[in-house]
């Protein structure tokens, strides 16, 4: 209803695929998007995708920088053409990837890994 209240042309609730929405014969718990992407692709031609996190486009096996690079490598040419990444500096899988989702490490160490990740890669 929030989308309708903001003027989006939503005719019914089936047009919104929120987290954990059952789609076809695909069962996936949590916030993974693979099932929803597959279902939409079977129903319609997807012209472009926009998101604020890498997981909006592909699913990396682990939340590390190396795994993210590997997951996106086949699609790198799609960014800016078919896929559009919207900046969101406060949220996304990229945020904890530099320290491999290890939330138990000290803040200073997390900051160090983030700064290291900002250095240009050759």
What kind of feature is each model-predicted range?
Residues 2-122:
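C-terminal cap/substrate-recognition subdomain and adjoining C-terminal extension
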């Amino acid at each position: 209803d929030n989308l309708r209240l903001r003027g989006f042309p939503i005719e019914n609730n089936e047009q919104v695929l929120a987290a954990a929405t059952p789609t076809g014969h695909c069962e996936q718990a949590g916030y993974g998007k693979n099932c929803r992407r597959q279902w939409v692709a079977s129903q319609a031609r997807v012209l472009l995708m926009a998101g604020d996190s890498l997981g909006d486009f592909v699913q990396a096996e682990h939340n590390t920088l190396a795994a993210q690079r590997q997951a996106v490598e086949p699609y790198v040419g799609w960014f800016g053409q078919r896929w559009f990444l919207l900046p969101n500096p406060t949220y996304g899988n990229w945020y904890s990837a530099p320290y491999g989702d290890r939330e138990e490490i000290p803040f200073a160490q997390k900051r160090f890994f983030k700064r290291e990740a900002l250095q240009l890669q050759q």
